[in-house]
Amino acid sequence: MTKTNLIIIGSGPGGYRAAHHAAQHGLTVTIIEAAEAGGTCLNRGCIPTKTLCRNAEVIDTMQHADVFGVALDGFQLQFPKVMERKQQVVEQLRSGIETLMQTPGITFVRGFAHFKDSETVVVGDEEYTADNIMIATGSDSKCPPIEGTTLPGVITSTELLDIDNIPERLCIIGAGVIGMEFASVFSSFGSKVSVIEFLKECLPVLDSDIAKRLRQTIGKRGVEFSMQSAVKSIAETTTEDGKRQLTVTYEKKGKPAQVDADVVLIATGRKPNIEGLDLELAGVEYSPKGIAVDDDFRTNVESIYAIGDVNGRCMLAHAATFQGLHVVNKILGKEDEINFDVMPSAIFTYPEAASVGKSEDQLKAEGCEYECRKGFHRSNGKALAMNETDGMVKLFVNKADGKILGCHAFGAHSSDMVQEISALMSKGATITDLANAIHIHPTIGEILHDIAL
């Protein structure tokens, strides 16, 4: 039996960063990984997706090259090279994490871990024990109870990231972050993209006004949206010339409708990875939504913590990272000032979108006295120079004390602007603090300064 100060199950953004942080502060760590180092984010999520997003952005820029006085006599998308580049980026970053896991004090174990009891984890024939255990097993794609989801060509984001050709017609079920990013990417790649969403608007994490404007902007590029639509089934059918296709049947406002596709992407959310962990043997409480934790991410078992997607609180890679750092700090007896109430997020469609804090919908529902300040990319010098005039920023301010309550935006550099507001919000800053901060000219970030004055 191997004993260390800390066992971490999972080497995603939460697990590997926590392991390194712990080792740097003198703890011995056993980190266990059933698949590839880096977890879903690096291997099947954030990084490969964002690599494809960059490819799509280059295509979009080339399609409008004439605006910049560049005459192109056509161009060819070499999809195998696109996917090769994606894999090279993933492998380079994975190699870096594997090197990081060689830090003195860290023992990296490959295999599937499950609990024997509240202090012991088993991997194969080996047993590992520690003073504290951190569960960081992430999440997996969630498939809705729809007839036909097991048919060939009905896939999740994992399979789409390894697809070997660009589908002529792509139907996406779900208009959340995953669905919207892939809709944007494959539309740029040349697919005819249809998106079916049950809710009234896409991207519920965003202010509904911002989400609607983003959807309309992407729609102008040819993506077809069917909102407030419930998918009933997916079936194999044939085209007029006898080729196999998939037909998605859905209901929109009580009326039946269909869309034909070559590939159907299921993008209806994710579920915590808890299967096979034998949490019952450790006495850890959980539900289908995830492992129950307190504000320090401790489970009902004092020495066991759960961070990231597996606790179901916030399925973002950076949320997992900072939750893991916070847990290590608690184990070390160190206080930190990480503010988990300020959790920014970004959607890398083209154009991109981002948010932090309250939306206008939430503020209205709470009856909060607030002021909404708006800015537009079309009025910004740098945005005009870049030909990136589609965009809007909404900044919400408490009328009583001027504190910034939230920022939601779409358009070029939205994630950068939201990052700035996140830093201010984490310190309880006011609109006056933003107005007094000198902003570089010319930058798109000046939109924030202009609406703060």
Please place each PLM-identified region on the residue numbering:
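Short hydrophobic core segments
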Residues: 7-9, 113, 128-138, 173, ...
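Beta1/beta-strand and adjacent pyrophosphate-binding region of the FAD-binding site
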Residues: 1-12, 166-176
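Glycine-rich dinucleotide-binding loop and its adjacent helix/turn
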Residues: 46, 137-192, 196, 224-225, ...
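FAD-site-proximal beta/loop scaffold in flavoenzymes
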Residues: 150-166, 258-259, 263-330
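Flexible, glycine-rich terminal cap/loop adjacent to redox cofactors
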Residues: 7-35, 40, 47, 51-58, ...
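A Rossmann-like FAD-binding core segment of flavoenzymes
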Residues: 107-110, 114-122, 190-295, 358, ...
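Hydrophobic "anchor" residues
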Residues: 48, 121, 272, 299, ...
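Glycine-rich flavin
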Residues: 2-4, 20-27, 32-166, 199-203, ...
